[in-house]
């Protein structure tokens, strides 16, 4: 599962060992301080679904090229667990595949024409 390996790399040996051995739960504030989470949502429960869907929409069609977002996620998830030179090779491979996509052509055309891109995921 990788929990011990990942947590140790993220928060350090001492804190990871303490948490896993004692079963200590981490507060949202501590998780944020250790960079395990990026944000703490503070709205009320009735607005949660709407706020999450609004936030997620920035990562989906037509607002973002989904292949690019997927490749960024893949590189960021895989990269830290492989040697640096392999991470660079993975990044080059993923970028090369994107440059041949319809979304890349659309992104370049939109930039040149000074308009908002309309990505399709192709």
Predicted features along the sequence, with ranges:
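Hydrophobic alpha-helical segments typical of transmembrane helices
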Residues: 3-6, 15, 68-71, 91-94, ...
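C-terminal long alpha-helix characteristic of the crotonase
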Residues: 28, 34-89, 102, 118-122
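Glycine-rich phosphate-binding loop at the start of an alpha helix
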Residues: 1, 25, 105
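C-terminal and late-domain segments of enzyme folds
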Residues: 97-98
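Conserved N-box asparagine in the HATPase_c
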Residues: 114
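Well-ordered beta-strand positions
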Residues: 18, 22-24, 30, 39
């Amino acid at each position: 599962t990788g929990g011990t390996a990942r947590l140790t790399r993220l928060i350090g040996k001492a804190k990871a060992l303490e948490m896993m051995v004692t079963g200590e739960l981490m507060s949202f504030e501590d998780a944020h301080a250790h960079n395990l989470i990026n944000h703490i949502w503070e709205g009320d429960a009735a607005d949660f679904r709407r706020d999450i869907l609004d936030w997620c929409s920035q990562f989906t069609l037509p607002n973002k090229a989904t292949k690019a977002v997927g490749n960024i996620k893949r590189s960021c998830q895989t990269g830290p667990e492989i040697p640096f030179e392999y991470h660079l090779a993975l990044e080059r491979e993923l970028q090369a595949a994107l440059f041949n996509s319809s979304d890349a052509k659309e992104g370049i055309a939109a930039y040149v024409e000074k308009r908002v891109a309309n990505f399709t995921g192709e």
